[in-house]
Structure formats: C-alpha cells, structure tokens
Amino acid sequence: MDPGYINSYGKTLFKYLSDYYWRIEASGLENIPGHGSGILAGMHRGFMPWDGVMALHLVVSKTGRYPRFLTHSGLLKFPFLANFMTKLGGVVACQQSAERILSSGELIGIFPEGIRGAFTRYREAYKLQGFGRDTFVKLALQHRAPIVPFVTVGSAEIFPIFAKIESKCWTRYTEWPCIPITPTFPLLPIPLPSKWHTRFLPPMDVAREYSPEAAQDRAIVRAISREVRAKMQQAVDEMLARRRSIYHGSVFKSEEVA
C-alpha cells in the first residue's frame, strides 16, 4: 500500500469519479471503526474493481483510515491493474492475507459473494448471491473484529452484463469465468456515468456474543453469514424502492448523507 499514491489520486481522479462522474452519495460512514481491526463486507458489481476503489476513497477521505481490499488474482494478471491495485493496498484474496491484515489491527475489505457477484447478469444484479465458505465470518470471530456490511446501488449500471461468452482460453489466462458483454465492454471499456448510492450499515460486533472458538461451529458461522446477507439485501431493496432514476436523484434523506 502507498498512502501517498492514494492521497494523490484522492485529490484528482478518484475525486472526479466520485464527485462528478458517478456523483456518489454515501451514508453511514460513521459506522466505520475509528481504530482497530474491522471487516468491511461489501457487494461487488460491474466486474471491474471500481466499486472497491470508490469504497476505499470514501473511507480514506471521510475517516482517514486505509482499508486493504482482498483482490481476485485474475485482476493482478493485467500489468496495468496489478501495479494500480497493489499501490491501493489490494492483496491477493486468501486467508493468509486476511489473517495478516487483521492481526495488524487494520481494516480489510471483503466481497463475500466472490467472483460470482462481480459477473452477475444485470437482470439479477441487485439480488445477492450466496456467500460461499463464509471465511469472513470465521475471521471476524477469530480476530474479534466487527463486521460492517456495505452496499452500493448504481455500480451495477457502469458495466451492465447482458450476456456472457464462455471461453476456456480466456478463463485460463484471466481466471474470469466468462467474457462479459455489456453496452461498452469489451469493444470500448468505458464505464457508464450512473448515479451511485453507497450505504455502510451499523457494525455487527460478533465478539460480544461469541467466543473465538465459535469460528469452528458451522451452524453459528452460517447463521451470522445469513444475518449479514439479509441485512445487505434489505438495504439494497430499500434503496432500490427509493430510486427514481439510474442517472439522477438520491435515495437518502439529506441528514443521512456524509
């Protein structure tokens, strides 16, 4: 991670994208822990890492903390993305990386749906996929770290996936499950200027209710995971119900916006 690099882009490219291109409105940033470890569990759409980058920008600019996001190894196979993501603090998504970050008292960003969420077809973009092995819950229990779920409405529209092309060669090289077909990708990989709304939900302090040993209890881990997913889905549904346009308007009350 290079804080100077992040701060430089935070005043230029990231600020432009956040404030003018996607016009991001954020709510609940006060829920980010001011110190110590914590897990930011998000919903990733659009297959490119822009929603993670914008979440990083929001947290850094509003709280001064620098979360490290777990990054799919496929993104790091592209040289121009590998350097970019590494300087932003991205680390290869694996348990060892997560353990190291949490043990250092840092924030970690995780997308529990995994790569399936990133490649969700647009017609199902705002229905959360399954959370896989629930490793993020086990990490929260073992490291006594609060879980802060967060969701974004609007990021699915930057590269809305209408079709997928299966290609073994493409998958072998990129580790992507398919070639996504959107209005602009792959012919012109420019994201669309949709309006974004990001909400950070109240932290779930699992350490208050469970001991670290609970990480070995499959039933407890699954129950916590389902609770996280349910809260995220409820937040998404509420935001969608308030959204009147993909490109304009707000889903938050004025006092909710950071």
Protein language model regions, located:
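Membrane-anchoring hydrophobic helices of lipid-metabolizing enzymes
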Residues: 1-58, 63-96, 237-258
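Non-catalytic C-terminal accessory region of glycerolipid acyltransferases
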Residues: 1-9, 100-258
